[in-house]
Each structure stands twice: as C-alpha cells, then as structure tokens.
Amino acid sequence: MNYFPDEVIEHVFDFVASHKDRNSISLVCKSWHKIERFSRKEVFIGNCYAINPERLIRRFPCLKSLTLKGKPHFADFNLVPHEWGGFVHPWIEALARSRVGLEELRLKRMVVTDESLDLLSRSFANFKSLVLVSCEGFTTDGLASIAANCRHLRELDLQENEIDDHRGQWLNCFPDSCTTLMSLNFACLKGETNVAALERLVARSPNLKSLKLNRAVPLDALARLMSCAPQLVDLGVGSYENEPDPESFAKLMTAIKKYTSLRSLSGFLEVAPLCLPAFYPICQNLISLNLSYAAEIQGNHLIKLIQLCKRLQRLWILDSIGDKGLAVVAATCKELQELRVFPSDVHGEEDNNASVTEVGLVAISAGCPKLHSILYFCKQMTNAALIAVAKNCPNFIRFRLCILEPHKPDHITFQSLDEGFGAIVQACKGLRRLSVSGLLTDQVFLYIGMYAEQLEMLSIAFAGDTDKGMLYVLNGCKKMRKLEIRDSPFGNAALLADVGRYETMRSLWMSSCEVTLGGCKRLAQNSPRLNVEIINENENNGMEQNEEDEREKVDKLYLYRTVVGTRKDAPPYVRIL
C-alpha cells in the first residue's frame, strides 16, 4: 500500500476501531507508524503505571479520548489497600500542559480530587464526556466545577463512586446555555438533589437519551422529568418506598405511556410494590433491565415484571429471585445475552433460602440459547449442571461462577468441580474471561491450559493443590493478559518457572499464596521491564523488619509490565523491587 497517499491510508485506519488492531497496524512500517501516531484519537490504558502521561502525549499528540484504569481488579473485593495509588492528577496536569484537545476521559478505580476535576474543567475548551467508575477522593464541589466550566458537556456518568456530598446544589451550576447534555448518571450520590435545577436542566436538553437518578429524587419529580424528556432511551429511577398518592401515580402513568423509545431501565433502590404497575407499559420494549439494587422487589411482583420483559438482552438481578424466578426468566427472555446474578446477602448473615443454585443456572442455559456472558453468585453447584450448561451455551465469552462458600464441592457427589469447569472450557471455544470457585484441584487448570486458547483474564480463588496448577495455565493460555489469584497454594516454583511469560501479560496479582520475598526478588532481578510490588498492610511489623528474611511469605504481590520504571507515589507499605 506504499503507493497510496497518506491521506488515503489514514482514512482506511479510521475504520479500524480495535485498540489491539491499531497497535498491530503501527508496527507494519515506519510510514504506517507515523500515520497511526497522528490519526489515533482514542487511547485505552489498562494500567496507569504502565506508562506515564508525557510518553503517551509524545506518542499520540492528537489524542481526544482517553480511558485509564488504576487499581487492580481485586480492589472491587477490598483486597487492595485504600491508599495504594492510582492518582489521576499527574495525568490531568500533563495533558493540560501539552494543550492536547482532550474531549473525553474515562477513569476506573482511580483517585480523583476536586482539584483534578477543576483543572480538567478549565483546561480543555471542547471537553464533552466524563465517565468515572469506582473512583474515590472527590466531592460534589468537583462536580460543580465540571458543570460550570464544561460548556459543551454531553456526558457525565458516575458509576459506583465514593463521593462526599459537600453541596447538594451542584446541579444548579450548569449554566442556562447548557443544552448539549446527552447522558447524565448520578445514581451513586447519597445526598439531597436540587430537583428544581435538575428539572430545568432536563427540560433544556433535547438530546438527552440517558438519565439515571439517585434515591433523593421523589416520585412526583420523576413524573415531571419523564414528561419533559419523552425521548429517553435509558432511565434509572430512584427510591420510592412510600405508597404513591393517586394524583402522583396518575401523573407517572401518563408520563410513562409516552415512553415508546425507552430500552433500558434500572434503579428501584427502595420501592413500594404499588409503584411497580406504573412501569409495566414500558416493559415490552426493554432490552436491558438492572435490578441489582432492588432488594425490595421480590416474589410475585418481581415475577410479574420479568414476564413482561420478553425482549430482554441484558439482565442484572439479585439472587433473591431464586431458582423459580430464573426459570421464569428462561421461559420469557429468549433473546437474553448477558445475565448477572448478585448476592443479596454478601455477608452471609441471613438464612437465605431464596439463593440460586445449579437448578437456576441449568434452566437459564436451556431457555436462553443466545446467552454469551454470565456472572453467577450461588450457594452450591454440581459437575452435572456445569456439563449441561456447557452443552446448552457453547458461545460463552465470559463465564464467572462464584460459589459463596470457599472449597465447596459438588454438593451431590462431594467431588471436586474439575470436570464441570473442564466441560466449560472445552465447549466454549471463544471464552475470554473466566472466574472459577468451589473445590478445585490442579486438574481443572490442566483443562484450562489445554482448551482455553482465547482466554485473556482468569480469576482464581481458594483453588488448586500444587504449583503445577498455575504452571498449566501459564504454559497453556498464550493469550492471557490478566491473571489474579487469591488464597491458593501456588508458590515460587510456579512464579519463577517462565519469567519471560509475564512480558506478554498486563498484570499478575497473587494474595495469600505461597510466594516468598526471596522469590519476588529473583523475579525482579530477571525482569527489568516489570514492576514487582510487595504490599504489606501490617505496618506494625514494618516491612523493613522482614525484608532480609527471604523465606517470609508476602501478603500481596502485584506484578505488571511498564515502560517507565518504578512509580514514585507508592505508600510506605508498598515495596517495589
């Protein structure tokens, strides 16, 4: 293609959306590398310590959209210390100094401050989209800066963040000239909401397609918001624990009947059962339903709601739905592609007889032939059930099974679940993400290494017998990018068997395993392009006291590839070898 002008090649590159494919294109020749450098507008960085912002900007000076991840995935399970790192401020400072035309920023598991948000809002004149997922460190003062200064804002999406509500009036900071908003999600905010300011904002946003409210927005306000935004496609409702008065209910019904375009519904943080019938008219068009926080919707009310959603492709639900409820899903939702079943009692404090089991999983797999992604928290499982699921749904690309009790065997035969998970990886040739649990031996990892050729991310908890289990995975899964292990018997022999393997991976996490400080030191000596972090939260003992005892087991090991060396913001309890 050397005879094509650069402009033509650049136009061809515009049709290549995959970050992985764009990376491959840039390696073909110097000419393509240069063209890709100046034409790349979107960049994804899965680890904020793999590169620094200055190097990123030199590589892609025309950057407009940046996705950045901070803490490891196990931070979602409270396994990463609170102040470990993942600070976004150095990135925003560098981007501001470089004067790149940043328009979109997506952050996940990062520390974001009000100062960072204020700098972001003042540095990029055409900034349009901010998405924060599982972030912490900021308040509504920072959101007020974004609202006041980002005059072209189209998207403000706040998901699962820890936000201090210093000022409930942040919505009032959107100027009257702000009419560009297309997506607004503040469901994770716990404080009061300026309903009047919200109504004015929604009324002057004709292109608003997605609106997700927090629990402070009352039912009568919801009706008014829906009346002035009938174009919504995605709606997240708040908390309605009191029975509605007839007038409010009638207004809500009138507004909902106009919603012919709505395709996604979520929320219901608390809800009175009599409120639900108002939403029945829109259920027939829904393709996405998220009830993962709707603990109050149970029994016949939940079943009735599900039975009306015949076109669902995506369902997030609590395990209180029970196996009978999942059977209704299987009989009703023939287009279902993604299912997530979350635990309603995460601490195990209740005798939850409604929890789902292998019966519900088999029913779903038999009734939903298009299913390709599942997250399933359950109290028990059998090999026979997993074998049936593998036969019914061979198109899984994500299969995450979390049995709530560690080391729990097949509850009928009392055998390990090796054969069941083995059937999954054998049948599902396109499997890219897998989480395993229950009683598992090294045999299951032999199966994974042999058959999971496309696997990119594997999560292991309380599993395995010896170092062989981890070696089977590392030797067999050539496309593995992220491997995370907790409370398993893998040690130095597995860690050090093929150090070069980690050069092709994004990261390795091991906590409460058999790895020692000496093993980590040897790994670091042989891997100059890897950061080897030892995390010891027990500051009373002090890391210095144990650092010379190479037989000392490490609490947590986080290993990741980097091109910029050791990070400078590690807290005292993190030692980088």
Swiss-Prot record:
Amino-acid positions noted as binding 1D-myo-inositol hexakisphosphate in the UniProt annotation, renumbered to this chain: K69, K108, R109, R340, R398, F399, R400, R433, R481, K482, R506
Domain spans labelled F-box: 1-45
Region (Interaction with auxin-responsive proteins): 76-77, 343-348, 402-406, 461-462
GO cellular component: nucleus; SCF ubiquitin ligase complex
Chief localization: nucleus
InterPro entries found in the cross-reference section: COI1_F-box (IPR041567), F-box_dom (IPR001810), Leu-rich_rpt (IPR001611), LRR_dom_sf (IPR032675), Transp_inhibit (IPR041101)
Induction per the UniProt record: Repressed by miR393a (microRNA) in response to flg-22 (flagellin-derived peptide 22).
Subunit: Part of a SCF (SKP1-cullin-F-box) protein ligase complex. Interacts with CUL1 and SKP1A/ASK1. Interacts with Aux/IAA proteins (IAA7 and IAA12) in an auxin-dependent manner.
The protein's name in its UniProt record: Protein AUXIN SIGNALING F-BOX 3
Organism: Arabidopsis thaliana (Mouse-ear cress)
Gene: AFB3
